[in-house]
Amino acid sequence: MNTQATPSPQFYLTAPATCPYLPNQMERKVFTHLVGPRAPEMNDLLTQGGFRRSQNIAYRPACETCRACVSVRILTEQFQPTKSMRRVLAANSDVVATVHAAEPSTEQFALFRRYLDHRHQSGGMSDMSALDYAIMVEDTHVNTRIIEYRVREPGSGIDSSKRGELLAVALSDVMSDGLSMVYSFFNPELEKRSLGTFMIIDHITRTRALGLPHVYLGYWVDGSEKMGYKTRYHPQEHLTPRGWEIYSPKEE
């Protein structure tokens, strides 16, 4: 009987580039392509090993002099929202979340551009076009979903034909042990809603309902103010050289 071996993934190392998170640092990444029938399995294994997905690429930092980027995952079963998080849930009690296939829309892109123009006027994503956005959403060989968050239309009930204002969008991968939040964005003018926090709590709730243990948030960068929000959700684990370990915040 002839058997054809599945080729092992090939890994590559990027050239040094300026770090987008910390001053006076250079970054390098190791990456591989997520394609073919084994892509979902590989995405699971690599994410559990500290990689992140971007389109059909899985990557992780491989910096020569810095180890500030740390993979973070929330333990969904033990998670309890804080008082401020409960206020966020109350402020968004009029929001309805709907799960869709990984397909872009002009409405999503318009919100995406508003978010970038307000929050990320510089950086690698600042000049993304509608085509770039479509590629970001569609170029996936794993189980990826789009979650749209909208204001509930008065009297709409379960009638999905009545759609309220689009407030936020999350691009997420469904994995064997949880959900991985690949990218999310929201209306930056609605600060009082704290939509970023709301989406993370919603993912925790969804993951728990699936009976799965983890929500992956990507990298927390110690010393980067814009990444600080990722350590607010407890309990959570950080990937260390010894494996995944419970994170204990430093005493102020």
Swiss-Prot record:
EC number: 2.3.2.29
Entry keywords, A to Z: Acyltransferase, Cytoplasm, Transferase
Molecular-function GO terms, alphabetical: arginyl-tRNA--protein transferase activity; leucyl-tRNA--protein transferase activity
Catalytic activity: N-terminal L-glutamyl-[protein] + L-leucyl-tRNA(Leu) = N-terminal L-leucyl-L-glutamyl-[protein] + tRNA(Leu) + H(+); N-terminal L-aspartyl-[protein] + L-leucyl-tRNA(Leu) = N-terminal L-leucyl-L-aspartyl-[protein] + tRNA(Leu) + H(+)
Main location: cytoplasm
Compartment annotation: Cytoplasm
GO-annotated cellular components: cytoplasm
Gene Ontology biological process terms, A to Z: ubiquitin-dependent protein catabolic process via the N-end rule pathway
Entry keyword Membrane: no
Superkingdom as given in the UniProt entry: Bacteria
Disulfide bonds: none
Function: Functions in the N-end rule pathway of protein degradation where it conjugates Leu from its aminoacyl-tRNA to the N-termini of proteins containing an N-terminal aspartate or glutamate.
Entry-linked HAMAP family: Bpt
Family per record: Belongs to the R-transferase family. Bpt subfamily.
UniProt cross-references to NCBIfam families, sorted A to Z: PRK01305.1-3, PRK01305.1-4, PRK01305.2-3
The protein's name: Aspartate/glutamate leucyltransferase
